[in-house]
Amino acid sequence: MAAHDDDMNRGIRPGRGSDDPAGQIAYLEQEIAVLRRKLADSPRHTRILEERIVELQTNLAGVSAQNERLANTLREARDQIVALKEEVDRLAQPPAGFGVFLTANEDGTADIFTGGRKLRVNVSPSVELEELRRGQELMLNEALNVVEAMEYESVGDIVTLKEILEDGERALVVGHTDEERVVRLAEPLLDVTIRPGDALLLEPRSGYVYEVVPKSEVEELVLEEVPDIGYEQIGGLGNQIEMIRDAVELPYLYPDLFKEHELRPPKGVLLYGPPGCGKTLIAKAVANSLAKKVAEVTGQATGKSFFLNIKGPELLNKYVGETERQIRLVFQRAREKASEGTPVIVFFDEMESLFRTRGSGVSSDVENTIVPQLLAEIDGVEGLQNVVVIGASNREDMIDPAILRPGRLDVKIKIERPDAEAAKDIFGKYLTERLPLHTEDVGEHGGDRSATVHGMIQTAVEQMYAESEENRFLEVTYANGDKEVLYFKDFNSGAMIENIVGRAKKMAIKDFLEHSQKGLRVSHLLQACVDEFKENEDLPNTTNPDDWARISGKKGERIVYIRTLITGKQGADTGRSIDTVANTGQYL
């Protein structure tokens, strides 16, 4: 077979000689046929090879993607192993403790307090020993050495400062169970002025106090700022203002004259009278005026005085002794301010709520200890210098007589209801030429705005104080059978006048919005008076008319019967009668 193939390759036809032409032709024809078959089969082989190549390329891409996924999975597994190792190492570390810095030593060690023990430990080089402060919190490693400085403690117990000890670094405090304890002052408190009675934050384990905690029980009851109210803003109380200025300002401004005449300055002033007539307003103006007088005497640009406003009802506490303690703190605060030569006004508003007559049986008798506490503060062993006590009340008959006697509340000033002249003065504080006035009203007075305002006030006051049928308010019957008709002028007050002016201004605004007529008119004032009177028709709504009359400022025979005479806002008669309860015990 191999020899046959060699003969074919040499061009020799098998079985014949090399010189046979017919054989050579046949052989060549056969060779041509073979070549033609091979040529015909070559595209099919090419397609097979191309398909194989594509298949191999697809397999290669799949293997590469799978290899990439395996590589990513390996990387993620490695990262997780590293993270888990770090977590295991972190969890295997010993806990870090905390301590409180006490003091630094010359050898570079520090004394700390931790776990109820006082230790001397080393300090990490990363911590500056000189920058550590008393009471500062520290982080400790497992060997209890300092590795990091932290902030000061921010939580703990509340204690009350009793006194600071002589070394200036320790203090005597009282806990909530009245237990006394000596504590250390942390660095933040060494540069702060703290006073006995202040509430401090104590970390009980280390014995450090860190900061002063504002106490709402005292801070909210005491207003130390001087009110920005002057006597010129108070109308209709000229005589009362002069009396209180003589009682409060003269002793402080001219102490030498008082000493020369051997005259003792008054310790207190009682302002009493019906509600809404300016008692609290006068007390606020006293502190402001006193500050200005101090500036004039000392030659300073601004004077300084303190106004301690004690809110009587909020001072009451359900715990025995708490109210007395707060009164002591108030006067202690006043003495501290006054010791600097600054006048201090201690103002008790609604004084009857705290200092009622002892043994009256009309309350829980808590005043049996509250009243003596105030008496001891006013004229006890510790004198009050540059401190004036001012009390305000509309039920002075309920205040304990021991407080009202001379030597305590020496000066008693009655704040009366305003008469017609006083009402004009009060109206003048709220009705000024600066207000927008209606052109028709101004035109009636020849364009003079001052005359217009004066005329409006005159008209309003005349209507308010007229004893006319529409101004009748009450008919009272006394115990002896006499009857009396009371008018609205008998119950007028500065607060009511302010409210009337406010109503009139609101009416002027509504007229401008609805009718584009700008300016205040006298008709607005007159209508405001009518509305104010009618709105007060329910004022005497009480089961005890005698008590109501005392509050309203009506003195005289005991009242047993009240009948309202006012006509309702819709024109219907709303007259009502009110009977007294039996044996009220109140005589006017």
Curated annotation (Swiss-Prot):
GO MF entries: ATP binding; ATP hydrolysis activity
Keyword Chaperone: yes
Gene Ontology biological process terms in this record: modification-dependent protein catabolic process; proteasomal protein catabolic process
Residues engaged in binding ATP: 276-281
Biased segments, Basic and acidic residues type: 1-10
One GO CC term, this protein: proteasome complex
PROSITE patterns reported for this sequence: AAA
UniProt entry keywords in alphabetical sequence: ATP-binding, Chaperone, Coiled coil, Nucleotide-binding, Proteasome
ATP-binding keyword on record: yes
InterPro entries, A to Z: AAA+_ATPase, AAA_ATPase_domain, ATPase_AAA_core, ATPase_AAA_CS, NA-bd_OB-fold, P-loop_NTPase, Prot_ATP_ID_OB_2nd, Prot_ATP_ID_OB_N
Family of this protein: Belongs to the AAA ATPase family.
Subunit structure: Homohexamer. Assembles into a hexameric ring structure that caps the 20S proteasome core. Strongly interacts with the prokaryotic ubiquitin-like protein Pup through a hydrophobic interface; the interacting region of ARC lies in its N-terminal coiled-coil domain. There is one Pup binding site per ARC hexamer ring. Upon ATP-binding, the C-terminus of ARC interacts with the alpha-rings of the proteasome core, possibly by binding to the intersubunit pockets.
Domain comment, as recorded: Consists of three main regions, an N-terminal coiled-coil domain that binds to protein Pup and functions as a docking station, an interdomain involved in ARC hexamerization, and a C-terminal ATPase domain of the AAA type.
NCBIfam families: pup_AAA (TIGR03689)
Name of this chain's protein: Proteasome-associated ATPase
Organism: Streptomyces avermitilis (strain ATCC 31267 / DSM 46492 / JCM 5070 / NBRC 14893 / NCIMB 12804 / NRRL 8165 / MA-4680)
